[in-house]
């Protein structure tokens, strides 16, 4: 039995060695017994291979890890800019309701202040009144914002600033009010456009600092040759009393010609003022305006120059229940007979 003991040990050693992965070698001399060493220098049967470190071949490319370049803030900002541009481009994608015959905007079908852009590109048929109306602004406010003065000349493609997105503490804020207040204030502003301002009413300073009252009574004669705006009977005369008729009402037939009482420039043509129907206001000079209300249809456009006696409308009953023309004259913003 003792003769077989060395053989058993040899088999065990060979089995233990065969269970380990051979260590890498570079040449035959690396097969020397020094490649493997017993742990702690003992004669234990547990063996540990000594691994020889090899360098990666220089010709082999080693992939390098890189960090992500994702930048969510920049992408978000770009998206916001794109959305903003798209929004602005779509803002003017609308049509203004207009009378098919005269091309005059039908303000009763337009929501005051619906346009929310910060700029507006002028299109064919636009007026300062219309742009101010759809932007919820006052005409003077719009003109001041764009450094414009009367007469307001617009050109197609012209870009106007709108006060919707301009944080200016000096800007008068627009208010949400009902349509009757909007139209009354807007047309009254045009109706009173030639009324003297405070600066105009202040006399030139004198050493005694005396003041001179402004005479708002129209002169007995003027350089305007007035003519009757239409034929017919006066069914209601002028009254200076509070709530009185600030003009005259002339009866007639539907479609009868309504003519300019004097030469001038149309400063308003539309139906924004309730109670007056289709209304035309003509500015004759710095002192006088004339108005023509309740027309069946309007034949002139805003800013159009007209001659005395030129037909500007057809008589009708818009804004009332009687076919008539309401005709009125204002001198420095005051109704006169």
UniProtKB/Swiss-Prot annotation:
Signal sequence bounds: 1-16
Ranges for region Disordered: 192-215
Lipid linkage positions (S-diacylglycerol cysteine): 17
InterPro entries, per database record: Cell_wall_metabolism_enzyme, Dup_hybrid_motif, LysM_dom, LysM_dom_sf, Peptidase_M23
Cysteine disulfide links: none
Topology of the protein relative to the lipid bilayer: Lipid-anchor
Keyword vocabulary terms for this entry: Cell outer membrane, Lipoprotein, Membrane, Palmitate, Signal, Virulence
SUPFAM superfamilies from the UniProt entry: Duplicated hybrid motif
GO molecular function: metalloendopeptidase activity
Cytoplasm found in the keyword field: no
Entries under CDD domains matching the protein: LysM, M23_peptidase
Subcellular location: Cell outer membrane
Biological role: May be a virulence determinant.
Designated name of the protein: Outer membrane antigenic lipoprotein B
Source organism (scientific name): Histophilus somni (Haemophilus somnus)
Lineage: Bacteria, Pseudomonadati, Pseudomonadota, Gammaproteobacteria, Pasteurellales
């Amino acid at each position: 039995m003792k003769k077989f003991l060395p053989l058993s040990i040899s088999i065990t050693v060979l089995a233990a060695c065969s269970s380990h992965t051979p260590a890498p070698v570079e040449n035959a001399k690396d097969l020397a017994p020094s490649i493997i060493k017993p742990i702690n220098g003992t004669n234990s049967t547990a063996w540990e291979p000594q691994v020889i470190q090899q360098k990666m071949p220089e010709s082999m490319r080693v992939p390098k890890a890189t960090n992500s370049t994702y930048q969510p803030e920049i992408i978000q900002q770009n998206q916001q800019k794109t959305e903003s541009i798209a929004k602005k481009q779509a803002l003017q994608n609308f049509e203004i309701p207009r009378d098919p015959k005269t091309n005059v905007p039908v303000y009763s079908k337009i929501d005051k202040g619906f346009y929310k852009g910060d700029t507006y590109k002028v299109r064919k048929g636009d007026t300062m009144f219309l742009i101010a109306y759809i932007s919820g602004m006052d005409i003077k406010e719009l003109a001041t914002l764009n450094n414009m003065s009367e007469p307001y000349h617009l050109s197609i493609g012209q870009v106007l600033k709108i006060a919707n997105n301009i944080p200016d503490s000096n800007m008068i804020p627009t208010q949400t009010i009902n349509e009757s207040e909007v139209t009354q204030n807007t047309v009254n502003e045009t109706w009173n456009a030639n009324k003297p301002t405070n600066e105009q009413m202040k006399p030139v300073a004198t050493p005694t600092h005396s003041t001179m009252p402004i005479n708002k009574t129209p002169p007995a004669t003027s350089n305007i040759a007035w003519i009757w705006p239409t034929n017919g009977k006066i069914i209601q005369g002028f009254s200076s009393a509070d709530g009185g008729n600030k003009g005259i009402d002339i009866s007639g037939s539907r479609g009868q010609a309504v003519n300019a009482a004097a030469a001038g420039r149309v400063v308003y043509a539309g139906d924004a003022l309730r109670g007056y129907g289709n209304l035309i206001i003509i500015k004759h000079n710095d002192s006088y305006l004339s108005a023509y209300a309740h027309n069946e249809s309007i034949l002139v456009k805003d800013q159009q120059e007209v001659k005395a006696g030129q037909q500007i409308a057809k008589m009708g009953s818009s804004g009332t229940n009687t076919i008539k023309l309401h005709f009125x004259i204002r001198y420095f913003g005051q109704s006169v007979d």
